Amino acid sequence: MKIDLNADLGEGCASDAELLTLVSSANIACGFHAGDAQTMQACVREAIKNGVAIGAHPSFPDRENFGRSAMQLPPETVFAQTLYQIGALAAITRAQGGVMCHVKPHGMLYNQAAKEAQLADAIARAVYACDPALILVGLAGSELIRAGERYGLVTREEVFADRGYQADGSLVPRSQPGALIENEEQALAQTLEMVQYGRVKSITGEWAMVTAQTVCLHGDGEHALAFARRLRATFAEKGIVVAA
């Protein structure tokens, strides 16, 4: 069994360099919620050095709230902003001799695109316009995955090690209790359940079916590195290969 392990990087966390030795894919902030040209260059350089797949992590234009504010923007605006961010990282990657592999939206852009078909379509269209060979990463079973499939993109369905799930397979909003799993044992057990059996227990106790093709590790958690190491070790024990 194989699983991709991804992390959001270039967002100002001191653990970026070490996380790049533990993950197989990096989602690099493109300036709209965090990061700038210099951090993008640095992350790309480290990702290439570690053989990690490089991806763009576009966001709503919301540096003040780290891309976590809901926005209602016209689809054409979202298309242009997404294309702008993807294109910037693609150029930086190409200039360093690398190849950009995937795109994963950030924060509220990701969450809204999981449920809003027009927004999902704008993102998928931007990815396709930039490079039809790019992989589109989105929440398992979401509108974003369906939009990517309509454009003929390769999609990658994502699950979260440290996030609570609702009965419909969506994430518990960060503003609600149960959104974040702080207990390491619980996060490990949830991740293995999703990867091995394709299901997750919701905060209300029901099982939700999920397709786990990539697992997100949040690099900004207090124990992010320790958890990443433990998850890698657990995967190794279970014979699960980590690869993009």
UniProtKB/Swiss-Prot annotation:
Gene3D superfamilies to which the protein is assigned, alphabetical: Glycoside hydrolase/deacetylase
Assembly, per entry: Forms a complex composed of PxpA, PxpB and PxpC.
Keyword Transferase annotated: no
Annotated EC: 3.5.2.9
NCBIfam families from the UniProt entry: PRK05406.1-1, PRK05406.1-3, PRK05406.1-4, PRK05406.1-5
Function of the molecule: Catalyzes the cleavage of 5-oxoproline to form L-glutamate coupled to the hydrolysis of ATP to ADP and inorganic phosphate.
Keyword annotations from UniProtKB, A to Z: ATP-binding, Hydrolase, Nucleotide-binding
Classification via SUPFAM superfamilies: Glycoside hydrolase/deacetylase
Annotated GO MF terms: 5-oxoprolinase (ATP-hydrolyzing) activity; ATP binding
Catalytic activity: 5-oxo-L-proline + ATP + 2 H2O = L-glutamate + ADP + phosphate + H(+)
GO terms classed as biological process: carbohydrate metabolic process
Domain of life, source organism: Bacteria
Protein's recorded name: 5-oxoprolinase subunit A
The family this protein is said to belong to: Belongs to the LamB/PxpA family.
